[in-house]
Each structure stands twice: as structure tokens, then as C-alpha cells.
Regions:
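Glycine-/small-residue-enriched capping loops at alpha/beta junctions
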Residues: 1-209
Length: 209
């Protein structure tokens, strides 16, 4: 049986990269914020002025509640604060969900940096990638530029091995979504076998069908 088969349409996820420094072309910075007992709890970071950002968030009424998104205007591009809830209650799934919400708020932007990975790099990568996942299928109408999903997200950090593993996980989930979203008229038992064989060969694995 031939392993040559391609899905009629593929979903899109942003380009993901890791950097120890703020990229010069970043149009926005996404940061996490906790819901503190006495107001906002903003994690410290070397990549922004916490005092200034905290004051702006307070002025805008941000609370840090889970999945709340607040955008702070800045001369170098907006700072997008996404709430992750109370610090003691945070776990990987809550961070993943918050990252997904943040990703969906970044439409129209080309390059964005984020410090979300400082709270958990794997969950942040998976949340951003899958939150921004877009599947248009048979739709052919052009999408206005300001409604396009974010094109590239740079995670500020240094753990390349953990980042690479998270990217692989996100890509695998996105591919599974492609299979679910594909029209049933385009998929049949032989095509699933061909897809599995092709994926195995691409990763230097052997497969028997």
C-alpha cells in the first residue's frame, strides 16, 4: 500500500521560537498576572517595568482573574496581561487555558513575545499554539488582516529541550485536530493507514499495517 496521502486542508498554528532576549520586532508582550488577596499580583520579570505595568493594570481595573485579558498601551507595543487566577491554585492546565485565551486575543499581530513560559514553559507553549490553531477547511473567502491569527510567538526563556518537547506535543495535537476536522468524504481506513505510515517514516520509525 502506498504511504502517499495528504489531507485536503491543514490547520494553522503560529511559528514558535525560544529566545533569551526580547526580539526587536515584537509588536506586543504577553505577561501573566495573578489574582492576589489584596489586588493584582504581577510576577517579576526582567523584560518589563513591573511598577509601571502594575499601575496601568490597576487603572484599567484588571483583577488577575483566570483567563481575563487586559491590554496596556505602551510606546513599544501593547502589554497583554492574562489572568491565571490565584497563585496557590495555579497548575499546568490553568496556565494552558490562560495562554490559549491570550493567543486568541492577538489577532492581527505578526510577532509577539511572552513571559508566560516563566510559570511553566511546556503548558505555555501548548496553550499558545493550540489556542491560536485555526482551521479554515473549504472556506475560500479572504480573512481581513486584523482578524488573522498571530503569526509568530517568541517565548522568553532558555530551556531549549523542554521547549522543543512542548512544540512536538502541540504539533501532534494540531495534527489530530486536522484529522477530526477533515471532511469524512476525504478519509477512509486506507488513508488513515497511509497517514500513520507517512508520519512514522518522517520520524525514522518503522510501522507495520
Amino acid at each position: 500500500m502506498s504511504s502517499e496521502f495528504s489531507l485536503p486542508h491543514r490547520g494553522v498554528v503560529p511559528e514558535l521560537s525560544l529566545s533569551a532576549e526580547m526580539p526587536q520586532d515584537a509588536e506586543a508582550l504577553v505577561v501573566p498576572v495573578f489574582q492576589g488577596e489584596d489586588g493584582l499580583d504581577l510576577p517579576e520579570s526582567e523584560f518589563f517595568d513591573g511598577v509601571t505595568v502594575r499601575a496601568a493594570l490597576d487603572m484599567l481595573g484588571a483583577t488577575g482573574a483566570a483567563e481575563e485579558v487586559t491590554k496596556v498601551p505602551a510606546s513599544t507595543g501593547p502589554i497583554v496581561a492574562v489572568g491565571v487566577g490565584k497563585r496557590d491554585d495555579m497548575d499546568a492546565e490553568k496556565l494552558r487555558r490562560a495562554a490559549g485565551v491570550a493567543a486568541r486575543s492577538l489577532t492581527g499581530l505578526k510577532v509577539v513575545a511572552t513571559t508566560l513560559g516563566e510559570l511553566g514553559l511546556a503548558a505555555a507553549v501548548e496553550g499558545i499554539a493550540l489556542g491560536a490553531y485555526t482551521y479554515r477547511g473549504l472556506k475560500t473567502a479572504d480573512v481581513p488582516e486584523d482578524q488573522q491569527p498571530v503569526q509568530k510567538v517568541v517565548f522568553l526563556g532558555k530551556d531549549q529541550a523542554l521547549f522543543d518537547a512542548a512544540v512536538i506535543t502541540a504539533e501532534a495535537v494540531a495534527f489530530a485536530r486536522d484529522l477530526v476536522n477533515a471532511p469524512s468524504s476525504h478519509l477512509f481506513p486506507e488513508s488513515y493507514a497511509a497517514i500513520a505510515t507517512s508520519a512514522a517514516e518522517d520520524n525514522d520509525l518503522t510501522v507495520e499495517v
